[in-house]
Amino acid sequence: KFTTTKGEIVVALTHTKTPGTVGNFVALAEGNLENEAKPQGQPYYDGLKFHRVIPDFMVQGGCPQGTGTGNPGYQFDDEFHPDLKHHGPGILSMANAGPGTNGSQFFITHIATPWLDGKHTVFGNVIEGQDIVDAIEQGDTMTVEILRQGEAATSWNAVEAFRTFEGERTKRIEEEKRKQNELLDKVSAGY
């Protein structure tokens, strides 16, 4: 739940379809993920501003500097799911500067933005308060409270979900290096 200068926005997070991205968001929001912007134990998003607002497009927040240039001190890969698209207003998605540059910044759409599909990870949608999203102005502040409903949500470990996702990235990189070395060995053997 986002509590903003304008009112409350309730979002449903897609933790089963984008566990790494949701894990990052939840762990930061609850103050459980190490980062360079705030001490561990302090909820990351509390007091941050919506630093970028483009009417009839989206509102963006999550930058610790309030300028759009900040991050938590790390970046992580995109996590696209075929069922999750920017198909209408109220889509919660990661803001980034290109592939693999996700951190803490996010945006919520005012309208459908299909040109962002495959470029920005969708990880939730507004279920209450789209009128508040539409009323947010640049500089409005937020706090984020994670409302865990049901046994699955209560027992879900956000930090573990994010670390698992990051571990898969490391495995993908190592596998790619192994394949490149194999190819290099094959090419070298022919000379």
Regions from the language model: what does each represent?
Residues K1-Y191:
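Cyclophilin-like peptidyl-prolyl cis-trans isomerases
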